[in-house]
């Protein structure tokens, strides 16, 4: 049956059995969804707490290597060209898997036992969809119920919210407001752009007539989505995303306000202003009326929630333009912050800004992780945000009080004309940073004296310094070529943090990633005819050169390990262990400059993809096509299983028809983005045929 715009392909109907016989008892706390049957994976992070934990114990260290691939779902044909990216984690609800795929971000329902496609939905084409960014970075879907009926909630790159019947893929009746565009259904959709801009001064003053096909004119701004909504206590909470700040050249954009809708009706409920308006808390952190014209501050990363307490946790990114903020003086709340919002009202309960006046692309890239732990003999409900700076900021998730002291420490000032940085930044005292925060001679490559000399000589051409190193422009009086941002924005962005809620241990995937960058006048990089260029006013400075810091003879300039997994006991803030992620890449082992040397395990050049179960930490190193079983308490590798391609982004699991499954997203330059499901053979699982 051919697929048409705005339609669904129904391949197989009927209810699919879900079973949880193998799932061990799990303590029910405010961090978890008390209504979720054991063995389900209802959120992209497994639970509302985003732990990526499956409380199942069938797969153990003893039988892990008996895992076999039972099906592969390929994403080859879900866009205008083959897509080698699949940045979405499936959810498992009521016996069915749901995910998004391809550059069209098609919604897909999959039989969890066989990998068959059950139905698909693709939104009709619009101009605003074509202007979307990160269209294939949807990360997944959300689920809920309306009068006992399972519903899948989907946010599109064009910024529409859809409510789909989980069984059939049809849009829910009497939900939302009809969109007056060809191919859209009569019901089951909300156009969220009008709710976003209806009280926004630049829109009201523009005189534009709203066009649902075009969306917001690009001289005002543009936004999309790159994570699913989260459904909490009958409320659908929606974040958004803008063009990457390092591509922006103009100072205006739409603020990424957080929106909420009634899950049963699609009715608009509330909006939280991420850039405070006059009279709102934080408005005074925007000087020179910069709040009027500045945008972004969205939540492109997934959100998490504490349903029992009615709180949703929102990680935000910086305001418009990375690496220069002279046009937006002040600390710029609620940029690069953690927000705790009342899900009923949208009111701020507490917040913490992890970077003041962020210009370093240090947006908070991970969903906050919620745990209940015992700290100094007292049971504490906590929330942890792992950041690009290499920190794990930890708070009481009810009050926002830091679990351990966070110190405001002096940082370097900028000598860039027009820039005024914050004189201090917040540094957690515990846990210690999980990534290096300055590139010095002490952490340069030292496999041989010659390689080290080359690295030391290379570093002389760059402006280096501790964390929050100020950017410099091309032609800086120092003669330095660029400034080094260390860590860079890639340190922990692609491998979600996971946790074991039973033990309170957090597992962080981190990659050593420093970058060399410099600035030029905005006119040098502006592309006025690019449909993704937004705003009207050229920035005084924009980033010109974003590149890896090249080491000697093509080797990394820094010492290994190149990537690691770090286990942190969140009751003490101390490391349990840290291990290289995977094994030394072939290009390092076989490098001519290292011939004859005994090179220790450097780890992969990439992020670990992880999930936890009652028995194991399961990881894919991101470089080699393998899956590892790891001892949660020691980090020791316990088993290995081959995959058809390296694992990427998110891993998930579920118990279906009495058997525990692990699903890994795999992809490579020669292997289209796919889902691979593994389970034990019946005999190994101790099951009768």
Q: PLM features: residue spans?
A:
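Extracytoplasmic/lumenal domain signature
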Residues: 63-76, 107-131, 161-219, 251, ...
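Bacterial N-terminal signal peptides that target proteins for export
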Residues: 1-13
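Repeat-blade elements of multi-bladed beta-propeller folds
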Residues: 41-45, 83-106, 132-160, 221-250, ...
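Bacterial N-terminal signal peptides
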Residues: 11-21
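Asp/Glu-centered strand-loop micro-motifs enriched in Gly/Pro and often flanked by an aromatic residue
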Residues: 54-98, 480-488
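N-terminal pre-domain segments of enzymes
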Residues: 25-58, 423-453, 457, 686-689
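Charge-patterned, long linear interaction tracts outside catalytic cores
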Residues: 259, 488-491
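Acidic, proline/glycine-rich low-complexity intrinsically disordered segments
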Residues: 30, 36-41, 48-49, 71, ...
């Amino acid at each position: 049956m051919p697929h048409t715009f705005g339609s669904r392909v129904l391949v197989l109907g009927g209810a699919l059995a879900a079973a949880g016989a193998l799932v061990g008892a799990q303590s029910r706390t405010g961090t978890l969804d008390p209504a979720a049957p054991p063995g389900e994976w209802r959120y992209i992070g497994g639970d509302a707490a985003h732990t990526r934990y499956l409380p199942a114990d069938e797969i153990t260290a003893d039988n892990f290597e008996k895992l076999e691939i039972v099906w592969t779902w390929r994403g080859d044909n879900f866009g205008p060209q083959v897509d080698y990216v699949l940045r979405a984690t499936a959810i498992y609800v009521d016996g069915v898997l749901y995910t998004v795929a391809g550059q069209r971000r098609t919604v897909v329902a999959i039989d969890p036992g066989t990998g068959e496609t059950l139905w698909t939905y693709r939104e009709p084409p619009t101009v605003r969809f074509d202007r979307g960014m990160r269209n294939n970075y949807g990360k997944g879907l959300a689920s809920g119920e309306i009068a006992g009926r399972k519903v899948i909630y989907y946010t599109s790159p064009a910024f529409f919210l859809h409510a789909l019947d989980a069984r059939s893929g049809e849009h829910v009746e009497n939900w939302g407001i009809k969109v007056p565009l060809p191919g859209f259904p009569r019901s089951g959709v909300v156009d969220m752009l009008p709710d976003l801009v209806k009280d926004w001064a630049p829109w009201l003053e523009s005189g534009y007539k709203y066009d649902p096909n075009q969306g917001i004119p690009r001289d005002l701004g543009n936004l999309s989505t790159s994570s699913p909504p989260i459904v909490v206590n009958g409320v659908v909470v929606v974040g958004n995303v803008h063009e990457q700040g390092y591509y922006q050249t103009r100072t205006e954009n739409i603020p990424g306000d957080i929106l909420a809708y009634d899950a049963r009706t699609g009715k608009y409920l509330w909006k939280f202003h991420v850039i405070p308006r006059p009279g709102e808390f934080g408005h005074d952190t925007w000087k020179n009326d910069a709040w009027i014209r500045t945008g972004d501050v969205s939540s492109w990363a997934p959100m998490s929630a504490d349903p029992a307490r009615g709180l949703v946790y929102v990680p935000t990114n910086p305001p418009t333009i990375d690496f220069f903020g002279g046009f937006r003086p002040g600390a710029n709340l609620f940029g690069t912050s953690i927000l705790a919002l009342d899900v009923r009202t949208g009111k701020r309960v507490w917040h913490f800004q992890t970077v003041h006046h962020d210009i370093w692309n240090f947006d908070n890239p991970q969903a906050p992780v919620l745990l209940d732990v015992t700290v100094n003999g007292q049971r504490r409900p906590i929330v942890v945000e792992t950041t690009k700076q290499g920190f794990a900021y930890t708070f009481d998730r009810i009050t926002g009080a830091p679990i351990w002291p966070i110190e405001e420490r002096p940082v370097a000032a900028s000598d860039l004309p027009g820039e005024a940085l914050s004189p201090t930044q917040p540094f957690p005292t515990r846990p210690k940073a999980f990534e290096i925060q300055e590139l010095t001679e002490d952490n340069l490559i030292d496999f041989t004296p010659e390689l080290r000399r080359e690295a030391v000589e290379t570093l002389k051409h760059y402006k280096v310094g501790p964390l929050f190193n100020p950017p410099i422009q091309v032609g800086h009086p120092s003669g330095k070529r660029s400034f080094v941002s260390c860590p860079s924005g890639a340190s922990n962005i692609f491998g979600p943090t996971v946790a074991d809620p039973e033990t309170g241990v957090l597992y962080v995937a981190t990659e050593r990633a420093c970058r060399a960058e410099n600035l030029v006048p905005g006119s040098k990089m502006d592309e006025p005819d690019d449909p993704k260029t937004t705003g009207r006013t050229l920035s005084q400075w924009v980033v010109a050169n974003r590149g890896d810091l090249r080491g000697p003879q093509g080797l990394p300039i820094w010492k290994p390990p190149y990537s690691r997994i770090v286990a942190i006991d969140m009751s003490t803030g101390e490391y349990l262990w840290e291990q290289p992620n995977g094994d030394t890449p072939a290009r390092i082992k076989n490098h001519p400059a290292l011939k004859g040397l005994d090179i220790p395990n450097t780890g992969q050049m990439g992020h670990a993809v992880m999930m936890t179960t009652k028995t194991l930490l399961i990881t894919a190193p991101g470089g080699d096509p393998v899956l590892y079983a790891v001892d949660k308490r020691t980090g020791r590798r316990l088993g290995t299983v081959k995959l058809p391609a390296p694992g990427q982004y998110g891993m998930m699991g579920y118990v279906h028809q009495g058997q525990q499954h692990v699903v890994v997203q795999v992809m490579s330059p020669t292997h289209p983005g796919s889902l691979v499901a593994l389970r034990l053979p019946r005999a190994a699982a101790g099951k009768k045929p």
